[in-house]
């Protein structure tokens, strides 16, 4: 009877151990796939912007819609996307970093673009355009209401100086705030003129 009980206990221990190992493996594999998916998305932004910067054009612009969420092994992972600029030996660096919305201090993945162009990042605070300083984050949250699920990039070349501008906007099924009359692009353009710069021409 004692041997039978011990065998059952050993079997239970084995089952629990196997369950723990499988759960640990699944969790870690899921995290690896998630990080890879997020990094791939961020690198897509960096590569596209790099192509915009090195192209022989004097003005270019493009909206970037970001995913509403990422999915890892059937689980929805909601996140925030952080854009910031930092100094770099080449000139400037535009940094993209995605954080799990449940754990904002946890960076899922990051990517960056180093360029000799000047980088300027703007936010909209209380309806007013604000230019962010170095390492200040522009935070996009596709789950916010109203959504901040896109950013817009504009490349300008004035007097030989190339500048890459980035600012937030929203794209929904029925509307967008990125460009056009009354758009955030128009507001940033007006901000530049008011501060001695030139309006966007593209």
Q: What residues fall within each predicted segment?
A:
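Long, compositionally biased, intrinsically disordered regions
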Residues: 20-202
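N-terminal single-pass transmembrane signal-anchor helix
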Residues: 1-30
């Amino acid at each position: 009877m004692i041997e039978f009980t011990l065998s059952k206990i050993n079997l239970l221990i084995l089952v629990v151990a196997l369950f723990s190992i499988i759960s640990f493996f699944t969790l870690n594999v899921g995290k690896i796939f998630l990080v890879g998916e997020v990094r791939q998305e961020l690198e897509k932004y960096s590569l596209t912007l790099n192509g915009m910067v090195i192209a022989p054009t004097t003005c270019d612009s493009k909206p970037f819609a970001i995913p509403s969420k990422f999915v890892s092994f059937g689980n929805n992972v909601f996140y925030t996307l952080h854009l910031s600029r930092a100094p770099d030996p080449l000139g400037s660096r535009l940094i993209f970093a995605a954080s799990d919305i449940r754990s904002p201090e946890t960076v899922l993945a990051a990517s960056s673009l180093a360029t000799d162009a000047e980088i300027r990042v703007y936010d909209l605070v209380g309806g007013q355009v604000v230019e962010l300083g170095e390492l200040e984050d522009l935070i996009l949250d596709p789950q916010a209401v109203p959504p901040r699920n896109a950013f817009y990039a504009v490349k300008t070349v004035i007097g030989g100086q190339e500048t890459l501008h980035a600012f937030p906007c929203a794209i929904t099924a029925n509307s967008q705030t990125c460009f056009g009359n009354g758009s955030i692009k128009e507001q940033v353009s007006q901000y530049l003129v008011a501060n001695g710069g030139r309006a966007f021409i593209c």
